[in-house]
Amino acid sequence: MNPQRRRRLWWVLALLLAGGLATTLVSMALQRNVAYLYTPSEVLRGDAGENSRFRLGGMVEKGSFQRASGALEAHFRVTDGDAQLPVSYDRILPDLFREGQAVVATGRMQSGVFVAEDVLAKHDETYMPKEVADKMGSAHRKHDVPAAANQGGALR
């Protein structure tokens, strides 16, 4: 093998190695930042996995919101119509956060309580995140809730 071919071979191998390393690093970064959406029923069934970071979607259960006066930490329950999951959040809640409204929270389970790092509330009366609407729709079908009750909140 002449020196020019050998040099070209080394360059090709170096580029392949660099490409493989870059692909591996990007893949690892994306895996760490992925947070799948689960309903309270799916979490209680064990679908979310222990110590994994995920998004919890559903409705804030009416009458469940609690916050001590002067404190930032809030406690509430998220429901999908079948199950309720207690949530703890120690930051400022969005202005549109209310009981009976759709919410998507990102965080982890700790001792039976979902500890949220981030909470997103729906932004108007007619919108519900598509993923939450789909998962809530399956709960409605399970309980034979009329289709009209499910159609008002889903984004089309």
Curated annotation (Swiss-Prot):
Topology, Periplasmic side: 30-156
Transmembrane segments: 9-29
GO biological process entries: cytochrome complex assembly
InterPro entries: CcmE (IPR004329), CcmE-like_sf (IPR036127), NA-bd_OB-fold (IPR012340)
Keywords per UniProt: Cell inner membrane, Cell membrane, Cytochrome c-type biogenesis, Heme, Iron, Membrane, Metal-binding, Signal-anchor, Transmembrane, Transmembrane helix
Cytoplasmic compartment spans: 1-8
UniProt subcellular location: Cell inner membrane
Record's GO cellular component terms: plasma membrane
Gene3D superfamilies listed in its UniProt record: Nucleic acid-binding proteins (2.40.50.140)
Pfam families recorded: CcmE
Family: Belongs to the CcmE/CycJ family.
Function recorded in the entry: Heme chaperone required for the biogenesis of c-type cytochromes. Transiently binds heme delivered by CcmC and transfers the heme to apo-cytochromes in a process facilitated by CcmF and CcmH.
Protein name: Cytochrome c-type biogenesis protein CcmE 2
Organism (species): Xanthomonas oryzae pv. oryzae (strain KACC10331 / KXO85)
Upper classification of the organism: Bacteria, Pseudomonadati, Pseudomonadota, Gammaproteobacteria, Lysobacterales
